[in-house]
Structure formats: C-alpha cells, structure tokens
C-alpha cells in the first residue's frame, strides 16, 4: 500500500510514545514523512520504540528520543530545548501521555494516586503546550493534537480521575485554540475510541468490583469482539498535523465515528458553529420548551 506523505518535512514532538497509541502515532507520522522526537518516562521501552520507528524512516528523517516526565516543568523545558536542537525546528505537538489513575469509589481511592493521575493528564498536557507555543507564535504556525478519551463526554463512575482530567483537557484545548487562532496555530482533540492497549489491560485487571459490573462487562466484550484499531486514531493524528487541516481548530473529533477525512471541506461551517465541541444541553436542544425562561 502506498502511504501518502502528507507530513513531508514536518517535525513533531510526541509524548507517551513508547507504546500503545503513542507508538502507533509515531510510526504513522514517520511513514507520512515527518521527523519525530519521542518522549516517555520508561527509557527502556523508549529505546525499543525508537528502533521500531526508525526502521520506517527514510534517510533524511530523524527519529529522536528523550526520557521525560511531562508533568515535571524542568523535564518539559529540557525536552523542548532538545527537540528544537535535534530536529532543527517544530511544527507539531502531539499530547498523548496519560493514565487511568485509581479505580473505585471516590471516597476510597488512594489520594496520592488520584492527584498523580490528574497531574499527568492535565499538567502533562498544559506544560508541553506552554513550552511549544512561544516557538509556534514566533513562526506563526503550529499544530497541537491533544488525545482525549471517553471520559471527556460521558460519565465514568469509579474511574473519576481519568474522566475528570479528560474533560478538563478537552476544554483546555478549546480555550487555547481561541487564544492562539490569530497566530496560525490549530489546537484539536482526538477521541480515539476504545483501544486494546495497556490501559485496557489495567482496567480489566482491576475487575468489576473496582470499575463497576456494567462497565467491566462492556469493556471485556469490546476487548474480545473488537476495539478500535490503533491505526484509526493514528491516521486522524496525521490528518490534524497536516496542511489539509489548516484552519480547523478547537474541535473534539472522534476517530472512529466522525468523517474527519473531509473536514477541510467544511471549514466555514465548523468555524461558525459549535459542532464537535463540548456544550451544555438545554431542553430546547431536545425539542422541549419547558426549560426556557
């Protein structure tokens, strides 16, 4: 199959890139022509990821890695400096790093685990954004691709840290998108669908007693019958990093359910509406009149 190199010459920083969706995105980016900086906390897995991704790269592409904790300001500052030095510039940030955090009733989950999950999922997105935006503003161009999840749009009882933090980063991305729209910077979030990754394994290992019987059964069924392929979310990440998506910003886009391949044909409608955003639903949105004052 011929891969269209829509990211030819572009440079990307991808967090949480040592496994799962982050690794799939890294591979897709290199196949699309980009040079990449991969970061994660596990140096050993990161080295393995570098080898796998580099095997897909052409001679003129760079595949660099750096161990970093994206929730630690000094780590992120050093990561940004290394990225600019080793890649020679940067056009794309993919914020993929994230964790489920503790699972169980909110009154009994471990508080340190809860705050750590919130730190990784929220600050681990804010800090890389803060690091890249001065560079993006100076060059008046950039792409920020934020990974979201089911917790952003639906309640996830007993997976509170994940749900709350995912909702937070979607609103973060939308707010930053408005703030930087005059600099040619696009900021979008991806809902990748249910993925058969380490995080799914953690959820199933926690068991029904931790995550609730109904949710556990639904996830176990998905794991057996078919989750969303990693390549689907990775392909959307490529699209949102490419010139084809220029001007599409502030959106939460579902990789398996939205017709994202043709969103560039609807830039005007997107820019003038709240399509693909988080909003409060009022009665009239459901053809009810009793809610109007």
Could you say what each language-model-derived stretch is?
Residues 129, 165:
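Active-site helix of classical SDR
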Residues 11, 18-19:
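Conserved glycine-rich cofactor-binding loop
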Residues 43-44, 67-79, 111:
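The beta1-alpha1 cofactor-binding region of Rossmann-like NAD(H)/NADP(H)-dependent oxidoreductases
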Residues 32-48:
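Conserved glycine-rich Rossmann-like NAD(P)H-binding loop of the short-chain dehydrogenase/reductase
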Residues 154, 175-185, 244-246:
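Active-site-adjacent segment of SDR/Rossmann-fold oxidoreductases
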Residues 107-126, 141, 145, 169:
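Catalytic Tyr-X3-Lys loop
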Residues 189, 211-293:
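C-terminal helical subdomain
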Residues 77, 100-115, 138, 158-161:
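Conserved mid-core segment of classical short-chain dehydrogenase/reductases
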């Amino acid at each position: 199959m011929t891969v269209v190199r829509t990211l030819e010459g572009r440079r990307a920083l991808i967090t949480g890139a040592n496994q799962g969706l982050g690794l799939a995105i890294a591979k897709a980016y290199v196949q699309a022509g980009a040079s990449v900086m991969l970061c994660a906390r596990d140096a050993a897995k990161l080295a393995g990821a570098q080898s796998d991704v580099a095997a897909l790269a052409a001679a003129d592409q760079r595949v660099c890695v750096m161990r970093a904790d994206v929730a630690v300001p000094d780590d992120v500052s050093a990561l940004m400096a290394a990225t600019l030095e080793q890649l020679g510039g940067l056009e794309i940030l993919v914020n993929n790093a994230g964790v489920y955090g503790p699972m169980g009733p909110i009154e009994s989950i471990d508080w340190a685990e809860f705050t750590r999950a919130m730190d990784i999922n929220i600050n681990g997105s804010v800090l890389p954004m803060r690091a890249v935006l001065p560079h993006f503003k100076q060059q008046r161009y950039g792409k920020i691709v934020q990974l979201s999840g089911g917790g952003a749009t639906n309640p996830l009882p007993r997976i509170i840290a994940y749900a709350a933090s995912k909702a937070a980063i979607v609103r973060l991305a939308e707010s930053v998108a408005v703030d930087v729209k005059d600099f040619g910077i696009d900021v979008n979030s991806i809902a990748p669908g249910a993925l058969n990754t380490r995080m799914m394994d953690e959820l199933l290992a926690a068991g029904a007693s931790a995550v609730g019987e109904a949710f556990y059964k639904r996830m176990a069924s998905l794991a057996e019958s078919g989750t969303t392929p990693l390549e689907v979310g990775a392909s959307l990440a490529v699209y949102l990093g490419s010139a084809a998506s220029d001007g599409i910003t502030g959106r939460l886009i579902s990789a398996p359910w939205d017709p994202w391949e043709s969103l560039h044909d609807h830039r005007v409608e997107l820019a003038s509406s709240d399509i693909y955003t988080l909003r409060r639903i009022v009665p009239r949105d459901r053809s009810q009149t009793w809610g109007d004052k």
